[in-house]
Amino acid sequence: SSGSKDSTQGGSKTSSKGDNKLVVWTLTNDLVDYGKRFQEQTGVKVDTVVIEPADYPTKVQTALLAGETEPDIIVGEPQMLDDFYDAGFFANLDDFGAQDYKDKIVDYVWEVGQDSDGIQRAISYQITPAGFYYRRDIAKEVFGTDDPDEVGKLFSSYSTILDTAKKLKDKGYRIFSSDAELSYFSGDSAWVVDGKLNVDQARYDYMDLCVDLYKNDYTAYATQWSTPWYQAMAGEVPILSADIQSGADDSVNVWDSTQFEEATKDAQKTSVFAFGLPAWGVLTMRDHVGDTSGKWGVCAGPTYGFGGGTYIGISSNSKRQDTAWDFVKFCTLNEDTSDWWIDYSQGDTVSYLPALEKHKDDENEIYGGEKLYQFWLEQAKGIDYSKVTRYDKQIGDAWSQAISAIKTGEKSKEDAVNAFYDTVQSTFPEIEIDR
């Protein structure tokens, strides 16, 4: 409990009272807003530094290994956390009584914040399960319904997705901007089981689906985060070619909106049916839907997936750990803060269960009045975190490279899969591989 903490750490308690300050190192702007609010409510001066995700692990490592006592608050995305835990960078939150709050946070988020010994090291303020954001008007026209449960059936397996894509193309639409929209639904099994590489049939089914979507022109060939990808949220987009997407044809610059418009002014146009994104996609879509606002719905995909999320903890070197714990609680375990964030962010999905419960009947007008908090909570309940391993990002990237090599004709399926095995073997020699 916090009582025993005070007596064991008398020194740090006194010094933290002395300077009434916190230094936060984070990856996104969210904590800038949280920091300002914490400062307003507590009088603690919060100095928040936002660092590029690519540079973040190195910066934290350099500071903490050098014994720096600031930052006080550090964060991590899920794929960074295991290394941070192993290095001892995060203080033990159970010393502050974190387990008292176990039932207040969505299960998978609580588990992500634990190290391999089950000690709580970090907590996130948001849940990030994935779903498909689809156009209700197109669903009605092509499939006769825009009901999320019914539309979910069109995405319920890799083979039904291919069938859905064909029907949409026959009506002049494209199912996705590109096959990258499937990346959060790339499989439902662990990549590594008992030290062995595990490539199950579903991984191959996913691979085949990506290749088929690409080869049959079922997508608009618009890369995620590019100009046409954002445009597709607001309405019609030019249909690009596979060569433009792969970069083999560089006549169209998809990263510069002015050049893009000029280069594609005579191109055939289409509307894109769906985007595959985690719950934070609500915010991305909000800023880009324009005139299609109200015409969207959200439904489940073929597997339970999640992506991203900012997990907050205390630096083990911090001399202000009690104040830092107050900040962690303020961001993640506080109903007032959760209510404020739901409103302020215009729809980010918090992890604090009492707030999700309270907002479960909130209707989101951009999505035709759908009750999104209820939907995301259901999706989050389906996430089995025991299937997540520290190897996922690199093995998943290597599998994606194999898929790209097959769909662009650079390699045969057999050669691409063998190259995948080679990559895994050289990157992680400790993993046993049966070819």
Question: Which residues fall in each region the model found?
Answer:
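Helix-loop-helix "hinge/cap" segment bordering the ligand-binding cleft or interdomain interface
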Residues: 96-100, 114-183, 191-227, 316-322, ...
